[in-house]
C-alpha cells in the first residue's frame, strides 16, 4: 500500500490548496478527490482554450512507459504526419497565442506545428508539465500492474502518489491551476492554444468540471493503450477543446 507520508508535506499542502481553489477536496490519507457540493469554478477570462497533445511516440507504439527524457520519446512517422496535418488546419481557430510545455516531446511537437507559418506566437510555460514516469521508463503495463505506487496513482487515483523522481496527478492538476492564473492575468479575451500532454488535458477537464466526477470514464487501460489498440482512435497530435 502506498504511504502518502513518503511525499513531502509541503508538496501535499501545495496540491491541496491549489485544488481547493477550484472546489476540489482531497482526502489526506487516501489522496482521493471529489468536487465540494455547492462550489463553482473561478472565472476563466480568456475566450477559449484548446489543447494539442504531443505527437505519437515510439513508446506509445510499443506500449511502453516513458519519462520526460527517455529514448522512446521519439516520434513515429505516423505521429509526425498527423501533427503536420493538424498544424495546417489551425488558421480556422484564429488563435491569439500558443503556450507549450517544457519537455522535449512537447517542445518538438511545437516545432512541427510552427514549421508551418502560423498567425500566433508560441511561448514556453514551465507549468504545462504533465505526468513524468521517471523510474518506469521502458516498462509495460504488465510490468507495473502489481506495483503499489502504480496501483495508487493510476487505479486508486491517489493525488499524492508518484515515483521518487516522478510526478503525481495532484501536482499536474495543481500546475494547471497556475497556468489558468497565467491565462487570466495575461490573455483575457484571447483564444489560447496549449501544446502539452494527455495528463494535462485530463487535468484541465477535471478543474473545469467536464464530467460529473473527476475520474468518470478514466481507465488506466485507456490512458496507456493496454492491449490491442490497433482500431482505437488516438488523439496524439490532435486538437481538443477545453473551454
Locate predicted features:
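Acidic, low-complexity terminal tails and accessory targeting/binding regions
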Residues: 1-47, 131-143, 185-190, 205-243
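Generic beta-sheet signal
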Residues: 49, 190-198
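General small-molecule cofactor/ligand-binding pocket signal
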Residues: 50, 123-126, 240
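Active-site metal-binding loops of divalent metal-dependent hydrolases
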Residues: 55, 198-199
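Phosphate-handling substructures
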Residues: 59, 70-74, 115-175
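Active-site catalytic microenvironments for nucleophilic, acid-base chemistry
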Residues: 89, 112-116, 182, 186, ...
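Short beta-strand scaffold positions
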Residues: 100-101, 174, 195-196
